[in-house]
């Protein structure tokens, strides 16, 4: 009876990750986890779900907040570092064309299930991510758009009024909610995103024109002299 020759099992040597690669791997896996399950639980539970030990996780991120901040930097700030401020401020091009191109690129960056779920989860959890991001949108995007609208309307450069900011937020928020309806609620939407942006711009620019006209009327109004 012939004896079978034992099969030699070759151990696959795993590539040892560098510190930077390991850190990036943690951030990527944490991003996926936060998008699916939110931000609940402590570092021990987080390490278990990431498939690593808690001490190893601590070597790269001393606290859960540190990991969340890195996820925020990668997911939220990374896509925004694309020179959009220069695009919005380029007065050699028509304002409407700049806004159309900006919101096309902006929504291309944020309209993903992962991005939107993390944003909504962080809002429910009361994390700083939302406050940071809302502040960034106000200071870097909406204030700049209002400044360009004021220039287009021939108004003096000044701090945005409450009415101007609110109009800009309604416009911006409407475009944002299009993404929520499509990628979070799986609700039917107009599939032509460029057309949606163009329609929203019609409403916003008409509204800003009315605000500009009201401001001009107030400047022209005669001053009543008492007595």
Describe the function of each predicted region.
Residues 1-21, 87, 212-227:
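N-terminal intrinsically disordered/low-complexity leader segments
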Residues 22, 64, 71, 75-76, ...:
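Hydrophobic/aromatic residues within well-ordered alpha-helical segments
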Residues 25, 29, 33-70:
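Helix-turn-helix
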Residues 71-101:
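Amphipathic alpha-helical linker/stalk segments
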Residues 85, 90-91, 97, 108-144, ...:
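Short secondary-structure transition hinges
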Residues 103-106, 119-123, 171, 175, ...:
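Short alpha-helical scaffolding segments that buttress acidic/His motifs in well-ordered protein cores
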Residues 108, 128-154, 166-169, 198, ...:
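Amphipathic alpha-helical packing segments from all-alpha helical-bundle domains
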Residues 158-184, 192-206, 227:
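Hydrophobic alpha-helical segments that form the core
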